[in-house]
């Protein structure tokens, strides 16, 4: 799904829409989902359907609630590659057992005091998982020193991911990304370091530049910040994804 649907077939659709409609479609986007909704399928399936029409087959999902409630959505979209980010405390035996039948999902476990226990549960159930951590200006030392990647090695993670807190300075972000790329090129660890935002942007620039990174909050409002520094006023539950991208992510708009 990631290689063919996301980066080949989907990329072809993304490029065609850019060429014919001047809309800059991202190859991936983020959904922060409130798992307390009674019927997540009726609330979110239309978003996946709209995304696939635009060539988007890769989704990064996050919930600070119960990730097991998101599994039916993932199961209902077997042609998509799903990255499910969740808190380590939410990784239970019940969740792992329910996830065993899904083969289009990578589970991202938050880096904290319970990460090792969560990884052990997922490994016992033979699930694909990695760890991720959000860092600030004062929390980058473990990443730069390599201790975070070495911990991921011990957890048998194929990937070790970092993402910058919104308040993180540009200089720290750049230093972390240089360290991530350097370790990856040198194959320094038995895990592949990934900077989630920078690497998504890099792949997006290969598929169809300029890359756009967008996401939607639980209430449907958009994460992306416009070029003028003001939040974009869009809501995925009130507008179609195509209309949002056409209005605020068209080539003429961005230039």
Predicted features along the sequence, with ranges:
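Non-membrane alpha-helical secondary structure
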Residues: 2-6, 36-40, 114, 233, ...
């Amino acid at each position: 799904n990631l290689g063919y649907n996301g980066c080949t077939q989907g990329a072809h659709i993304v490029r065609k829409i850019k060429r014919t409609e001047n809309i800059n479609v991202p190859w991936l986007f983020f959904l922060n989902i409130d798992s307390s909704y009674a019927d997540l399928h009726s609330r979110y399936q239309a978003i996946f359907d709209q995304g696939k029409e635009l060539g988007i087959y890769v989704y990064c999902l996050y919930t600070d609630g119960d990730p097991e409630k998101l599994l039916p959505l993932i199961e209902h979209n077997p042609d998509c590659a799903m990255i499910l980010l969740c808190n380590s405390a939410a990784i239970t035996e019940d969740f792992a057992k329910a996830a065993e039948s899904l083969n289009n999902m990578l589970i991202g476990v938050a880096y904290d005091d319970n990460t090792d226990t969560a990884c052990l549960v997922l490994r016992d159930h033979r699930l694909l998982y990695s760890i991720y951590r959000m860092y600030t200006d004062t929390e980058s030392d473990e990443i730069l020193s390599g201790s975070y990647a070495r911990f991921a090695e011990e957890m048998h993670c194929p990937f070790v991911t970092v993402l910058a807190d919104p308040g993180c300075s540009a200089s720290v972000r750049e230093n972390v990304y240089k360290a991530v790329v350097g370790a990856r090129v040198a194959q320094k660890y038995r895990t592949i370091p990934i900077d989630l935002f920078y690497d998504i942007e890099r792949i997006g620039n290969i598929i169809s530049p300029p890359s756009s990174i967008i996401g939607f909050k639980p209430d449907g409002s958009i994460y992306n910040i416009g070029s003028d520094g003001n939040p974009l006023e869009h809501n995925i539950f009130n507008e179609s994804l195509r209309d949002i991208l056409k209005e605020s992510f068209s080539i003429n708009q961005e230039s």
